[in-house]
Amino acid sequence: VKLAGKKCKICCTRKTIPNLRVIQKYAVKLGGGTNHRFNLSDEFLIKDNHIASSNIRDFVSLAIKNKKGRKITVEVDNLNQLRAIMGLKFNTVLFDNMNINNLKAGVKIAKKYYETEASGNINLKTVKSVAATGVDRISIGRITHSPSAIDLKLEI
């Protein structure tokens, strides 16, 4: 969280250990992170597998038409997908597995109109450079799906 700086939020994802979601999300908050999605019912999350079955602009337009008060996040993995959805009324662009140069370019294009989020293969070595692109938040799945154990012992 400290590596990302004060302007960029670190978020966990929906990927949690079965039956431990509430506890893991609480632990993220205690550690200074943010919970922005508890599950898929919180918002429309349009991912690459949805887009593969349709034109990205058409799919996002359909979600906008049926959103019923929920926010919409659209995952893009290249700048062409981003350009295709610009101008549509949704909430967040999720840049997935993009290299730093493309991420920086994407944030520059989208930042005025949408919240921005980066995700995919982000770790302690890369989080600072990802935050420096200007994204609003970074979601890191390994916070909840692959937590490391602490060495805790009690000696008497």
For the regions a protein language model found, what residue spans apply to each?
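Cys/His-rich Zn2+-binding cysteine-cluster or related metal-binding knuckle/ribbon modules and their
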Residues: 124
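Acidic/glycine-rich phosphate/pyrophosphate-binding loops and surrounding catalytic core
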Residues: 1-88, 92, 101-109, 113-118, ...
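Short secondary-structure boundary segments
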Residues: 97, 120, 142
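Active-site loop ensemble at the mouth of alpha/beta enzyme cores that anchors a bound cofactor
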Residues: 153-156
